[in-house]
Swiss-Prot record:
It is an enzyme of class 3 (hydrolase). One of its GO terms (molecular function) is metal ion binding. The gene is lpxC. Its EC number is 3.5.1.108. InterPro entries: Ribosomal_Su5_D2-typ_SF, UDP-acyl_GlcNac_deAcase, UDP-acyl_GlcNac_deAcase_C, UDP-acyl_N-AcGlcN_deAcase_N. SUPFAM superfamilies: Ribosomal protein S5 domain 2-like (SSF54211). It comes from the Bacteria. This is UDP-3-O-acyl-N-acetylglucosamine deacetylase. Transmembrane segments: none annotated.
Amino acid sequence: MNAYQKTIGRAVTLSGVGVHGGAPASARLLPADADTGILFQRSDIKDSAPVCAHVSQIGATDLCTSLGAREARIDTVEHLMAAISALGIDNLVVEIEGPEVPILDGTSARFIEAVDSVGVVTQDAKRRFIRILKTVRVEAGNSWGEFRPYDGTRFEVEIDFECPLIGRQKFAHDVDEETFRKELSTARTFGFMKDVERLWAAGLALGASLDNSLVIGDDNSIVNADGLRFKDEFVRHKTLDAVGDLALAGLPFIGCFSSYRGGHRLNSEAVKALLSDETAFEIIEA
């Protein structure tokens, strides 16, 4: 457990396209002072106010997690937030050119590479953590998510798809920087070929491609020539998403998060439920 807050050594920029709008997008990561937190700002909108990376600022959870509202909304923050969280970075300003964080390769790997290229700086301020004191659970139909006390940071994510290629998969592991790098960071976002036309008609997935998505064909086979990176790559990516979504609690947590058939909305509702119950957690200093 890192005792002191961290930021990055210098600014670094990543460019690509937005997975939903398909337009060019870039993210410039800049160092920030201790106790700043993670701030997002639309650099393409004059005088736009920074938005705190916090569950209270979530604007939408349809296929991705969005922060802010109206014309200054920033979509698809989860892969970047997962990398930031896993690397133990507490303070950062993220300038976004366009309405989306670039999808890059559909994972957190490129964000980690960018941070590695500029280094991490330890700051003269202690880290704070959310320690889970009791179980908090949310349900939606046959899906659920819950926090419970645990001496560490653990994710137990289970998915269950009708598609036989995916089926029922579970990832259960304590997640620290090393685990995230090795087991989760390269797991790709995924989708079904049968959904493509519907998504396009809705103005979504316009930037999706085999370069940034794992695609399941109509015959339930992998369309990508390189196949799966892990036999359970699907649940690993869902866990990556959960790491990013839960980072919007505003502080790293000590406890276990479990979910069944979860997603961005359920993840965010679980965080909101936790933070709304002051008896369910305490804030501690490292």
